[in-house]
Amino acid sequence: MKQSKVFIPTMKEVPAGAEALSHRLLLKAGLIKQSTSGIYSYLPLAARVLNNIEAIVREEMERIDAVEILMPALQQAELWEESGRWSAYGPELMRLQDRNGREFALGPTHEEVVTSIVRDELKSYKQLPLTLFQIQSKYRDEKRPRFGLLRGREFIMKDAYSFHADEDSLDASYQDMYNAYGRIFKRVGINARPVVADSGAIGGSHTHEFMALSEIGEDTIVYSEQSDYAANIEKAEVVYQANEKHEDLQPLTKIETPNIHTAQELATFLDKPLDEITKSMVFKIDGEFIMVLVRGHHELNDIKLKAYFGTDNIELASEDEIVNLLGAKPGSLGPVFDKEIKVYADNFIQDLNNIVVGANEDGYHLLNANIGRDFEVDAFGDFRFILEGEPLSDGSGPARFAEGIEVGQVFKLGTKYSESMNATFLDNQGKAQPLLMGCYGIGVSRTLSAIVEQNNDENGIIWPKSVTPFDLHLITINPKKDDQRELADQLYTQLKENYDVLYDDRKERAGVKFNDADLIGLPVRVVVGKNAAEGIVEVKRRDTGESEDVHVDNLINYVNTLYSNI
């Protein structure tokens, strides 16, 4: 395709708000254009890359007998009410009404729709297992869209759903999909690591995320250097090893702590280590108030809290609720009170004697509070995030951290949706049973960004040849010169028989063409320049920068060999 006919609006400068490298490069190379916050148009080069990614996804889905369908993006509220997610999903769900006042959602996922389809049509165990997938735009009302395609309000996903009669069948499909995802990410040129993860709003009992390693990743991966252990930090278990207490109990003492609002401020004010301070937080669980304690240098993990209590309906109490309950604002709270409020504490609170807690009076704290003497803890548990260097739960050594971008996730949903939506089948005894389900997603547009995050240099993108928008970049330095233009036209005709060729025939300066070529990042560049009269062209690899002068008589064989070795 001639570049003069292709819409590739490259940029010299990118908007200041483009934080992620992939966002800057995709804008600068003319692949995407922002419509509004979190919403982008995919321009010709991006559309070609997306097509290539989707082709690989389809090949791998068909390899494991997944069947492609296409479901509506507009979903009626009644289906979501059946599953219970209409009220539970939260403000990220884009809701709207038609002219008759009927409520709908723009689908972030399709569990409800696909379950309704299958329950109406699938009747017998003889029709199982069944795996359906689609590639479609999804919608999520992100509070703060950022990083370009990595966290947007409209995005492209491949989502698949499997249906089973028994656990063994679900396990087999889960493993097939897990393996297929590994192949997909390898083929598209991403270093993606599977990690144990939380199932979030989708639900289910077992899940892995595939994380593309990146400095701007919004998720932290906890991993071992001695084993294959890897988990999202939300799921990484903290191993508790009791430390014997040696301090004598000291008298409980109330002190004034004016204008102190955080654990760090309190530690500085008292000249104490942060790990000797206790943070007290009040939550509402299904309408009931509880207090949760963690040490000052630890961060509470609400995902673990939800897992411990077996509900997603957990939220921090508001300041007004806390004041009405305990008589003080956050920053002065503690477990020493005579209220009927259950207290839960992270395991490592057990290691402390004579701890510092809020006095439940603004501007005051208590020194030397002790469990069993001054307050009781109803239960201890793992309620916090692991710290780098702490021992891992598999015993393989210290925790190491890396940042990652989630590009895929696989779930075992079990009967979460089939039971709530009455999706059953008849087993071999003729008895109705709820369908077992799996759910599997790949962020196709996220994958586009992740590829760019991992494949670039200071000059631009370096496309893996499996997804590149064009195979070769043919450049004529000066198309006004007959020898260059005629040779370039001849080579274009020859090369496009076996390759997708982007032919830069524009009447631009050589520097502009070379800068754009580096920025766009096609795997191989063929330059027709000053030696055209002698039949000599320059062939250059984008990834290594290696170049060679080649006679046109040998060009096809040279390019074939070069391309096969990339």
Curated annotation (Swiss-Prot):
SUPFAM superfamilies: Class II aaRS ABD-related (SSF52954), Class II aaRS and biotin synthetases (SSF55681), YbaK/ProRS associated domain (SSF55826)
Statement: the UniProt record of this protein carries the keyword Protein biosynthesis: yes
Superkingdom of the organism of origin: Bacteria
Broad EC category: ligase
Signal peptide: none
The reaction(s) this protein catalyses: tRNA(Pro) + L-proline + ATP = L-prolyl-tRNA(Pro) + AMP + diphosphate
GO MF term set: aminoacyl-tRNA deacylase activity; ATP binding; catalytic activity, acting on a protein; proline-tRNA ligase activity; transferase activity
Keywords carried by this UniProt record: Aminoacyl-tRNA synthetase, ATP-binding, Cytoplasm, Ligase, Nucleotide-binding, Protein biosynthesis
PROSITE patterns xrefs: AA_TRNA_LIGASE_II
Catalytic activity, EC: 6.1.1.15
The keyword Protease appears for this protein: no
Chain segments annotated as transmembrane: none
A Pfam short name: tRNA-synt_2b
InterPro entries in alphabetical order: aa-tRNA-synt_IIb (IPR002314), aa-tRNA-synth_II (IPR006195), aa-tRNA-synth_II/BPL/LPL (IPR045864), Anticodon-bd (IPR004154), Anticodon-bd_dom_sf (IPR036621), Pro-tRNA-ligase_IIa (IPR002316), Pro-tRNA-synth_IIa_bac-type (IPR004500), Pro-tRNA-Synthase_IIa_type1 (IPR023717)
One GO BP: prolyl-tRNA aminoacylation
Compartments it resides in: Cytoplasm
GO cellular component labels: cytosol
Domain notes: Consists of three domains: the N-terminal catalytic domain, the editing domain and the C-terminal anticodon-binding domain.
Annotated HAMAP family: Pro_tRNA_synth_type1
PANTHER family, A to Z: MITOCHONDRIAL RIBOSOME PROTEIN L39/PROLYL-TRNA LIGASE FAMILY MEMBER, PROLINE--TRNA LIGASE
Protein purpose: Catalyzes the attachment of proline to tRNA(Pro) in a two-step reaction: proline is first activated by ATP to form Pro-AMP and then transferred to the acceptor end of tRNA(Pro). As ProRS can inadvertently accommodate and process non-cognate amino acids such as alanine and cysteine, to avoid such errors it has two additional distinct editing activities against alanine. One activity is designated as 'pretransfer' editing and involves the tRNA(Pro)-independent hydrolysis of activated Ala-AMP.
Similarity remark: Belongs to the class-II aminoacyl-tRNA synthetase family. ProS type 1 subfamily.
Subunit structure, interactors included: Homodimer.
Protein name as annotated: Proline--tRNA ligase
Organism listed in the record: Staphylococcus saprophyticus subsp. saprophyticus (strain ATCC 15305 / DSM 20229 / NCIMB 8711 / NCTC 7292 / S-41)
